[in-house]
């Protein structure tokens, strides 16, 4: 589908719903930049003007399948060796149960729609509505984590009220590149962008709560308005 043009959701492409499983192990920000070149509305698809759709399965689906298969293989191997230790059997059976539970709970397809024509978002699981609300409740956020040695890593997360946080890119040490990509995604989807700090002039707020409705996140001074060009995604 050409960039920037409306089109129907590629329902024939099963892999489209698994795109968030592959975030890139090395240079994750470059991996995301390549995806944005192929689809400037990533991870969404522009179904029609001002309407963006994202269909996906949780990555706990493949993790549960992997745990289930490994546990079943180990149970079979232990049976052949006639292992009688109760602790071993309890651990393996527990792995089978947890793996099966993860698979079953992750099988329902998720669907998130950003409808700027109506000014609302809609989130459903297997066709059943979970929540819907105004667009100021949906955002792209830069998140921060650190390891035991004090090294900082940044993640880009798509989140919102009663939405499952979706990691778009993770474990990058390059703040400027991650900020640029986060702002780019938020601008293309026309949603809010928030820095990893709760109060920051780097927030970009495009949608405010209606008067008297309260706020989910504290108001912050606006600053560093994104460049209107932002055509290059070389990072």
UniProtKB/Swiss-Prot annotation:
Annotated region described as Disordered, given as residue ranges: 215-235
Keyword DNA damage: no
Domain of life: Eukaryota
Subcellular location: Cell projection, Cilium, Flagellum membrane
InterPro entries reported for this sequence: TMEM249
Keywords on record: Cell membrane, Cell projection, Cilium, Flagellum, Membrane, Transmembrane, Transmembrane helix
Any matching Pfam family: TMEM249
Extracellular topological domain: 83-93
Name of the protein in question: Cation channel sperm-associated auxiliary subunit TMEM249
Organism annotation: Homo sapiens
């Amino acid at each position: 589908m050409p960039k920037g043009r409306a089109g129907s959701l590629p329902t024939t492409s099963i892999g489209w719903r698994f795109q968030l499983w592959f975030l890139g192990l090395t240079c994750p920000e470059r991996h995301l930049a390549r995806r944005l070149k192929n689809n400037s509305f990533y991870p969404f698809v522009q179904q029609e003007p001002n309407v963006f759709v994202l269909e996906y399965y949780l990555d706990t689906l493949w993790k549960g399948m992997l745990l289930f298969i490994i546990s079943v293989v180990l149970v079979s191997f232990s049976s052949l060796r006639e292992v009688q230790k109760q602790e071993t059997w309890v651990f393996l059976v527990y792995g089978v149960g947890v793996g099966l539970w993860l698979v079953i709970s992750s099988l329902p397809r998720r669907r998130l729609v950003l409808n700027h024509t109506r000014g609302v978002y809609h989130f459903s699981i297997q066709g059943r509505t979970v929540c819907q609300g105004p667009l100021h409740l949906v955002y792209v956020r830069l998140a921060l984590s650190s390891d035991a040695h004090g090294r900082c890593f940044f993640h880009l997360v798509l989140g919102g009220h009663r939405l499952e946080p979706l990691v778009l890119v993770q474990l990058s040490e390059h703040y400027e590149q991650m900020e640029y990509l986060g702002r780019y995604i938020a601008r293309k989807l026309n949603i809010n962008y928030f820095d990893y700090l709760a109060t920051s002039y780097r927030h970009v707020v495009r949608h405010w709560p209606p008067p008297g409705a309260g706020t989910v996140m504290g108001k912050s001074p606006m600053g560093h308005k994104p460049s209107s060009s932002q055509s290059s995604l070389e990072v």
